[in-house]
A protein has these predicted regions:
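Peripheral, non-AAA+ core regions of ATP-driven protein-machinery
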Residues: 1-4, 10-52, 56-277
Length: 277
């Protein structure tokens, strides 16, 4: 009688004696899940049950939403097929906080924890070794502040429609930032291909990286590198003005811990009297 039950995956299981429906159907999936719930919540013999499910191309749980409501915790493993990085995200947790992310590296031994994500996401370069198109910022993943590198490559296009690639950022956000840079910054990119990437293939949704993305593009266009001890943390409005981002103090403390000397932020971002110990 096991203490731990792992089902991989719920869409392949059936209760043949109870239901004639095929495996993976909504009815079968919910009946199997309810039976597993009964086993887990048995007062005389409680067990831990882990249900492995499938994801859709839209990064949502496949199947009925009721399945997500049935369980106590939902953990999602995010990955890009061409990267070793794996992110373990808690999207639901009845017994703790959500929005937290754990980072792992896929190796021949399996998933191994990345204990210092900030160091992992930065390219190690010698002092004075400046590379154009590279900037650094700090993102928040749950309660953690993580330093991340943004890379861009800008080149002349020879087609009527320039290429815009930003898998980890989002094409719509990239086009918006390019428009701001053209109108407010006076840098023409209508005849330029623009490719944006974050080291490790980390997906970025928060607006606090926008200034770093813009400065990365400018650095690539001008072919001038930015010092490796400088970071950019701010949103950029359609007017071209810098906007504050939340949890800035924690981000700056992470930069100080890693030896950074300068950070560009929006005006009046810090509370009066803020100091880095």
């Amino acid at each position: 009688d096991p203490d731990l039950i792992i089902i991989d995956s719920i869409q392949t299981f059936t209760m043949e004696n109870a239901l004639p429906a095929r495996a993976g159907s909504p009815t079968q999936t919910m009946e199997c899940a309810n039976e597993l719930l009964r086993l887990a919540k048995d007062d005389k013999r409680p067990r831990a049950v882990i249900i492995v499910g499938q994801m859709t191309k839209a990064d949502e749980l496949a199947g009925l939403r009721a399945l997500e409501h049935l369980v106590d915790t939902v953990l999602i493993i995010e990955a890009n097929s061409d990267e070793e990085l794996r992110g373990l995200i808690s999207s639901k947790n009845r017994f703790g906080s959500t929005g937290e992310t754990g980072f792992f590296q896929m190796t021949e031994k399996g998933m191994e924890s990345i204990d210092n994500p900030s160091e992992y996401f930065m390219t190690k370069r010698e002092d004075g070794d400046l590379v154009s198109g590279s900037t650094l910022t700090v993102v928040k993943e749950g309660s953690r502040a993580i330093i991340m590198e943004v890379e861009s490559l800008v080149s002349k296009t020879f087609t009527p429609y320039p290429t815009r690639i930003a898998e980890t950022l989002g094409k719509d956000k990239l086009n918006t930032l390019i428009s701001i840079l053209e109108i407010r910054g006076g840098i023409n990119l209508y005849d330029k291909n623009v490719i944006i990437k974050t080291t490790g293939g980390m997906r970025v949704k928060e607006p606090g990286v926008n200034l770093a993305v813009i400065m990365s593009i400018v650095s690539s266009v001008k072919n001038k590198g930015i010092p490796t001890d400088v970071a950019f943390i701010a949103d950029v409005g359609l007017t071209g003005e810098l906007k504050k981002v939340p949890s800035l103090e924690g981000r700056v403390r992470e930069l100080a811990r890693m030896g950074f000397r300068k950070v560009y932020v929006a005006k009046d971002s810090f509370a009066k009297g803020f100091k880095i110990e």
